[in-house]
Amino acid sequence: MTQAQTWSQRFEKALHPAIATFNASIGFDIELIEYDLTGSVAHAKMLVKTGIISPEEGEALVNGLETIREEYRQGQFNPGVDAEDIHFAVERRLTEIAGDVGKKLHTGRSRNDQVGTDTRLYLKDQIQQIRTQILEFQGVLLDLATNHVHTLIPGYTHLQRAQPLSLAHHLLAYVEMAHRDWERLGEVYQRVNTSPLGCGALAGTTFPIDRHYSAELLGFDRVYANSLDGVSDRDWAIEFLSASSLILVHLSRLSEEIIFWASQEFGFITLTDSCSTGSSIMPQKKNPDVPELVRGKTGRVFGHLQGLLVLMKGLPLAYNKDLQEDKEALFDAVKTVKGCLEAMTILLSQGMEFRPQRLAEAVAEDFSNATDVADYLATKGVPFREAYNLVGKVVRTCLESGKLLKDLTLDEWKSLHPEFDVDIYDAIAPLQVVAARNSYGGTGFEQVKSALQNARDRWEAAQS
């Protein structure tokens, strides 16, 4: 037999134990207990303000709820294995503490608007924490970029060396992605910050409640204008999962690059012992577990987004039990995003070191300065397309003779086109190749310094 639930008087027989277990959410929605208590305190105060319960009853309810909060924080709150959900567990314990007045707490409220309120309060809190983590991650990237303005790194397209870059420019690309993530979560927060409390099961209530007052107590900016929408809306959860997915897209892309950079084939970075592991059979190995796990965990959050979209697409108004499935997706996504941000921040600040000499060698041993040869001829009046075609022949000639562009003699250059002169060597030197790209947003050192300062100013403003 299972203990009677708040709704069980309608039924003649007890719920089958296996179905009770299947139906229960207490195993995961206990995550919401602090928010459930906060929402209930606000609801109790609203009931007093509107005269629905007496001040003495309201005081008893609030004191009882705060007692439960303290019990939970001290590890003394036991919801019981038979509790269907956290709402029932709290109400049962409240009635034990406050007596029959505890049964008045649910006046003018349904579990439908209650759980919607709890989950939004939870997510508001988590969004703020994640945004703080994003700023910490950005700060580490900015510090790295500051130290590597004049460090060169090969730039790639199609994973083929394309043009050399300032390493700071490369890192600042991720700063920009992180800033969009920070902004995007702020926009999601605005949608989450709407109170459904008082919407009831779906149609509102006959009690003279004050929804705006309870919303104000809970820090919501507004209330839902339609009770059906208030209890059935999960757009905000989908938006959060979408924003979380994009955060992890960016972390996963960086992780992929770090994995490449740490390989012997690239050798651009060295992994420190604090953020890498070894092999159980191959003693020479130092494995990039952190970026590999971030890359793998990204798929979890993608799955939660897809799962909630599929869950919602066929639901009629208003509340359906299917919506219970949104909690675990949200909880796991929050923990995954926070864990990945923390791990990547530690990895960038303590777990890897760039190898400037190896990076310089990589930039010097390829044809990533070929575009600059074409640009050189274009500045001499040669049409760019003609210059482009000529440089293709130059590269082919170098490949056939086993040379790099810098190895060609001036006579060889002139034999290819009379406009070539001794200044070609300066034009194709890696530092000059990078420095010359001073268009707005480019990798030129002056542009990078300016972009770095702008990004840091923006970062500092975001923390105020």
Swiss-Prot record:
GO terms for cellular component: cytosol. It is found in: Cytoplasm. One of its GO terms (molecular function) is argininosuccinate lyase activity. Pathway: Amino-acid biosynthesis; L-arginine biosynthesis; L-arginine from L-ornithine and carbamoyl phosphate: step 3/3. Keywords: Amino-acid biosynthesis, Arginine biosynthesis, Cytoplasm, Lyase. Optimum pH is 8.0. Shows more than 40% enzymatic activity in terms of relative activity at pH 7.0-9.5. It catalyses: 2-(N(omega)-L-arginino)succinate = fumarate + L-arginine. Its main location: cytoplasm. Its EC number is 4.3.2.1. Transmembrane segments: none annotated. Pfam families: ASL_C2, Lyase_1. SUPFAM superfamilies: L-aspartase-like. It comes from the Bacteria. InterPro entries: Arg_succ_lyase_C (IPR029419), Argininosuccinate_lyase (IPR009049), Fumarase/histidase_N (IPR024083), Fumarate_lyase_CS (IPR020557), Fumarate_lyase_fam (IPR000362), Fumarate_lyase_N (IPR022761), L-Aspartase-like (IPR008948). Optimum temperature is 42 degrees Celsius. Shows more than 40% enzymatic activity in terms of relative activity at 20-50 degrees Celsius. Inactive above 55 degrees Celsius. Strongly inhibited by L-arginine. Inhibitory effects are lowered at pH 7.0 compared to those at pH 8.0. At 37 degrees Celsius and pH 7.5, activity decreases to 73% and 31% in the presence of 1 mM and 10 mM arginine, respectively. Activity also decreases to 84%, 93%, 82% and 85% in the presence of 10 mM sodium citrate, citrulline, asparatate and glutamate, respectively. Activity decreases to 96% in presence of 1 mM L-lysine. One of its GO terms (biological process) is arginine biosynthetic process via ornithine. Belongs to the lyase 1 family. Argininosuccinate lyase subfamily. Catalyzes the last step of arginine biosynthesis, the conversion of argininosuccinate into L-arginine and fumarate. This is Argininosuccinate lyase. It comes from Arthrospira platensis (strain NIES-39 / UTEX 3086 / IAM M-135) (Spirulina platensis). The lineage of its organism: Bacteria, Bacillati, Cyanobacteriota, Cyanophyceae, Oscillatoriophycideae. The gene is argH.
